[in-house]
Amino acid sequence: AACFENNVEVIVLDRPNPLGGLKVDGPPLDARWKSYVGVFRVPYVHGLTIGELARMAKEAPGIMQVPGATGINVSEAVRARGKLNIISMRGWRRSMRWPETGLKWIPTSQYIQDFAAVIGYPMTGLGTELGSFSHGFPGPLYPFRGISHPKINDRQLEKELRALNLPG
């Protein structure tokens, strides 16, 4: 936002989506839940690269308006005149997941320290937004590898789930 407002070109060095560019799953973001972690009306698992997301932000009217969020609200006039330069990747194919790129993993947050956490995030990250659930065992030691709740007995839950004979 600050770059666009001050006529400074934004340069994005595109990088692979760790889950690949073909995996798309989940409903698109409901506009009522826009926040600094979810602005785009794309599925929860979207398959887009950071460059594609940046282009979407630049080209989609209204997408950079998030009431109450700081640092990302940009007027339509500023968005339209902002300069964006995306440097494309070489050698990446949409079918490639992170391990196939041969690139070194650099943690994207304190909780996403490795590719295992990337795989688990879509499955467990949303569940932890539902109240007292945790996405680590214990705390941040193994984030996004499962969920826990202080009032749920894991053995009893496992027994009840097995009794349902669910496929998979």
Predicted regions and their residues:
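Glycine-rich, charge-decorated loop segments at or immediately adjacent to ligand/cofactor-binding or catalytic sites
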Residues: 11-33
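Active-site-proximal beta-strand/loop segments in catalytic clefts of secreted hydrolases
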Residues: 13-16, 89-90, 147-149
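A short helix->loop->beta-strand "cap" motif at the edges of active sites that frequently abuts
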Residues: 5-9
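Cleft-lining beta-strand/loop regions that shape enzyme active-site pockets
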Residues: 1
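Conserved anion/nucleotide-ligand pocket segment
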Residues: 34-121
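Glycine-rich, aromatic-lined ligand/substrate-binding cores of catalytic
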Residues: 92-94, 98-168
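Residue-level preference for alpha-helix termini and adjacent loops
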Residues: 18, 23, 35, 39-47, ...
